[in-house]
Amino acid sequence: AITVDAPLQMLVLALVQDPYKGKMGIGKIQSGSIARRQTVMLLGKDGAQVAGKVSDLAVYSGLDRADMEQAAAGEIVAVAGLDDVSIGDTIADADRPVALPRVTIDEPTVQMTFSVNNSPFAGREGKFLTSRHLRERLFKELETNVSLRVNETDSADRFLVAGRGELHLSVLIEQMRREGYELQVSQPEVIVHREGGKVMEPYEELTIQVPETYQGTVIEELGKRRGEMRHMRLIHSDVGTSEMHLEYHIPTRGIMGLKNLLLAKTRGTVILHHVFAAYEPAEERDLLVTPHGSLVAYEDGASTGYAIFMTQERGAMFIGPGVEVYRGMVIGQNSRDEDLDVNVCKEKHLSNMRASGTDEALVLTPPREMTLEFALEYIGGDELVEVTPQHLRLRKRLLNPDDRRKAKKSGK
């Protein structure tokens, strides 16, 4: 409850880094009031108390933030001057400090590798390209993104970044992309723990709403991914349609790649939501996830309508004509579960019967729209997502097809 006539209490629920004011804690004042230059007590973990002074104060009104001299209970404010502030801390009255119930932050469940972009198109669009730029940006993010973890690897241009899910990490990637960074990211992997000699993996509670027509398709796919159905009920709408509401307990790795797959199989009618539940013992049997094969560009150049037309019967295309490609770039999904090197830069040459430009009109299937969410769900262990300010590209880790064949034979 909001109490005006009481000592100051404010629970910090978010952090923001201001270039001029430093780190600012954001939260709603539960009781009392706060003013600029006021001395307060910061109540942290395990009863820690640190005195501090409010150097700057801003009040939120909708999406706008305005500097103020003071704020009262019920207002959402941003407080500067407390360098040690963290999510879950209480900003309290200096003379009568009483902590509010602390919020807990979920541990990371998914990790992926962020590395310097080393593709043939590297450096064309971005402003920040080097490992130093990447390292500074990732470690700066730790100041406000408290559930993120960044670890250095044995390679100076590669970092292991862990977060609370694919969405958490994709938001960071999109922010960096808009800021002008170029980077490459790997396939997301779940983080497993070992407790008492047992391997523990993260599980989530998954809620799905889907038209009754597609319930069999959804249930079959979730069964392959070790989903355990907890609840199912039929929902009748006012317009005469029926939908199934399904609740599942499922491993986090069973959710990876699930959204786009179900959207395709249900013609875009499925709605799903998932939240972290707990770490539980990992089952020995593996997920029955169907592997995918990719169409991989065989040479550098610009794609042509003729080559796309001849290739599209092999599977779903990710690019259209007139797109620059490089050898080893993934340009589509093969209809078979194996990679296929294709030449999408091939020109139609003239013959002694007709000129190269005179032929029937080519009907090209529109390419699949490339989004960051789709890219992260699609890529396999031997593929990367190339992220630049203007483009998202999929590529093989090893661009040379001979190197890929050698690696496959050696089992790497």
Predicted regions and their residues:
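Structural and coupling elements of P-loop NTPases
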Residues: 1-412
